From Swiss-Prot:
Analgesic toxin that is blocked by atropine and naloxone, suggesting the involvement of cholinergic and opioidergic mechanisms in its antinociceptive effect. Shows cytolytic activity by forming pore in lipid membranes. GO terms for biological process: killing of cells of another organism. It comes from the Eukaryota. Belongs to the three-finger toxin family. Short-chain subfamily. Type IA cytotoxin sub-subfamily. It is found in: Secreted; Target cell membrane. It comes from Naja atra. Monomer. This is Cytotoxin najalgesin. Expressed by the venom gland. Disulfide bonds join C3-C21.
Length: 30
C-alpha cells in the first residue's frame, strides 16, 4: 500500500514506512 499523505489516519496503517509516511504528511501540511 502506498501511503496517502492527504489522509492522516492512513499513514498509521503503513507498517514499513510509518516514519516516512508521517514525515510526508507533515511536509504536505506545512
Amino acid at each position: 500500500l502506498k501511503c496517502n499523505k492527504l489522509v492522516p489516519l492512513f499513514y498509521k496503517t503503513c507498517p514499513a514506512g510509518k516514519n516516512l509516511c508521517y514525515k510526508m504528511f507533515m511536509v504536505s501540511n506545512k
